[in-house]
Amino acid sequence: ARACGNTVYSDVHLGDWGLQIGLVIAELNERNPGWKCFSEDFDPDKDSVPELNADLLSEVYPFASKKSKEDEAFKEKAHIATFDLQNGRAGYIALWKEILRVSIADLKSNYSKLGVDFDYWYGESDADKYIPELMKILEDKHLSYESDGALVVDVAKEDDKAPMPPVIVRKSDNSSIYATTDLATIIQRNRDFAPDRIWYVVDNRQELHFTQVFRCARRAQLVPDSTDLEFLGFGTMNGTDGKPYKTRDGGVMRLSD
């Protein structure tokens, strides 16, 4: 697109605001309960968090992910940590910033070796401030409704060849999820750039998710009808068993290696 003379802005869009962060925070808490950032009286102006590194985070995340599938109490702890982070708990915000610092430095190092760069290093967290506006739009347009404690929006069409489930915009515990931040990000991008096209270059397995998100965005008129929302899927790196690598499952060769 850029080679054809178009003005193009690239954004890495980090997954830095969901359960994966809550899992890491919960596991670090279990291993290091004495860290000041886990105290209710953490003061960001006076207190600090320990310095982390990429090797530690690469070990903690898959460990915590596996643990959450076997331990319901830990899974609930991770959900609570996610909720508290998204609601501004000071110690968690400070720890999150350290996790982000380490992660971005590691990503930039790898991308540099591949000759890849981005104009923006935004994450889901950058769209967080647009979520209240998103929820109000969905409510004012009578698009959102409660289902089993969660808030959802119908996106099915009469000519769908396969079932199209509603998109969940708020979980039953009132926390935001992937779709919430993706919809809020559409508001952000339209506000910042007023683009003619927004392309999502992501894993093929995300196609259903983005179909739901795009349909919801259209129903809510988050972008003008003239703005194209397009999913550009790519394949996966698979292991010897033929199954895609999953960072959260562990045992995956790091790109830097």
Give the residues covered by each predicted segment.
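NTP-dependent nucleotidyl-transfer catalytic core
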Residues: 2-257
